[in-house]
Curated annotation (Swiss-Prot):
GO terms for biological process: one-carbon metabolic process; S-adenosylmethionine biosynthetic process. CDD domains: S-AdoMet_synt. It comes from Stenotrophomonas maltophilia (strain R551-3). Belongs to the AdoMet synthase family. It catalyses: L-methionine + ATP + H2O = S-adenosyl-L-methionine + phosphate + diphosphate. The lineage of its organism: Bacteria, Pseudomonadati, Pseudomonadota, Gammaproteobacteria, Lysobacterales. The gene is metK. This is S-adenosylmethionine synthase.
Length: 403
């Protein structure tokens, strides 16, 4: 019998790196609301008393970057010097420039379907049937823990009013013969107000944050709980650590279970294949698994800057495929257009839906329909997390001739 442990972690929306991610994606959303053809590469750094927003942006839109940055910080919960960071009074430094015209000449085409990739690179997508979200269980549970922390913290008349925005989670699972059998260890560290006793904090976190999230069937007498194991966690957020866009790429994806091409997501418009192709690869892998072609599937795509067609598409199902990996790859090429324009059209990506992806994972979330007013004052309907749909599973299964 095969037995092993696997661990994944997540961080809350108040973690400094995630504050930076959310600011970068808020800038992207504000621009896409007015200009769907914009080119955006926005990076943010947050540290004590200041947010620095930099990058390369080419757009016809105008946004109030300072007000936008402050709103994101305050909405997260950094709204007072008592918390250590105040979005209303912190400095905001704008260091945004224009994108190189040499990149534009390689990406833009007269025919939109011939649009070239915004950069070279390799991207991975992954899916597994071990959870309803088609995500690895450890990262799924880690996300839900810090999501619950924020939910309780922001709740009106919260029973845990002393919670602060910064938090981290970690879940270690035991696998028996490739299937989750138990939770071996849980780590939950949360920033808190001064004066809370460690004993009270541990009890409250277990009851209000951990218990509602973790499946009882996987808990046992030997499960280890590490709640604020260092003791006090009063200094957090951008005061405790410098935050940067793009530093939580494993949290953003599959918690270390699948491979990663190295490119971050936040602050990048859909012409950047670092983001859009990673979303497309997840969409492909999820539909392959949802179709029953495999229990696990990892898809890799790669691109050359200025070139529309992917330089490679490869698939592995780790021995779980119901048909060969070669046949699955042929089906992928037939059913999915993985050129940059094809991805943007397939997933309808040129809409302001990215700030909500910047915390609690870009994958494993439910597709969410929404509407917004564009720059012309017209109402536009769109779907966030469109890459989580399984709308091509039936066609894949039929074409694979599986009963």
């Amino acid at each position: 019998m095969s037995s092993y442990l696997f661990t994944s972690e997540s961080v809350s929306e108040g973690h400094p790196d995630k504050v930076a991610d959310q600011i970068s994606d808020a800038v992207l959303d504000a621009i896409l609301t007015q200009d769907q053809r914009a080119r955006v590469a926005c990076e943010t750094m947050v540290k004590t008393g200041v947010a620095i927003v930099a990058g390369e942006i080419t757009t016809s839109a105008w946004i109030d970057l300072e007000a936008l940055t402050r709103k994101v910080i305050v909405d997260i919960g950094y709204d007072s010097s008592d918390v250590g960071f105040d979005g209303a009074t912190c400095g905001v430094l704008n260091l945004i420039g224009k994108q190189s015209p040499h990149i534009a000449q390689g990406v833009d085409r007269k025919k939109p379907e011939e649009m070239g990739a915004g950069d070279q690179g390799l991207m991975f997508g992954y899916a597994t049937n071990e959870t309803d979200s088609y995500m690895p269980a450890a990262i799924h549970l880690s996300h839900r823990l810090v999501e619950q922390q924020a939910k309780i913290r922001k709740k009106k008349n919260s029973p845990l009013s002393w919670l602060r925005p910064d938090a981290k989670s970690q879940v270690t699972l035991r696998y028996e013969n490739g299937v989750v059998s138990a939770i071996d260890a849980v780590v939950l560290s949360t920033q808190h107000a001064p004066g809370i006793k460690q004993k009270d904090l541990i009890e409250a976190v277990r009851e209000e944050i951990i218990k509602p999230v973790l499946p009882a069937k996987w808990l046992h007498k030997g499960t280890k709980f590490h709640i604020n194991p260092t003791g006090k966690f009063e200094i957090g957020g951008p005061v405790g650590d410098c935050g940067l866009t793009g530093r939580k790429i494993i949290v953003d994806t599959y918690g270390g279970w699948a491979r990663h091409g190295g490119g971050a997501f936040s602050g990048k418009d859909p012409s950047k294949v670092d983001r859009s192709a990673a979303y497309a690869a997840r969409y492909v892998a999820k539909n392959v698994v949802a179709a029953g072609l495999a229990d696990r599937c990892e898809v890799q795509v790669s691109y050359a800057i200025g070139v529309a067609e992917p330089t490679s598409i490869s698939v592995t199902t780790f021995g779980t495929g119901k048909i060969s990996d070669d046949k699955i790859e042929k089906l992928i090429r037939k059913h999915f257009d993985l050129r940059p324009y094809g991805i943007i059209k397939m997933l309808d990506l040129v809409h302001p839906m990215y700030q909500q992806t910047a915390a609690y994972g870009h994958f494993g979330r439910k597709p969410k329909e929404f509407s917004y007013l564009n720059g012309e004052g017209e109402t536009v309907n769109a779907t966030a997390f469109s890459w989580e749909k399984t709308d091509r599973a039936a066609a894949l299964r039929a074409d694979a001739k599986l009963k």
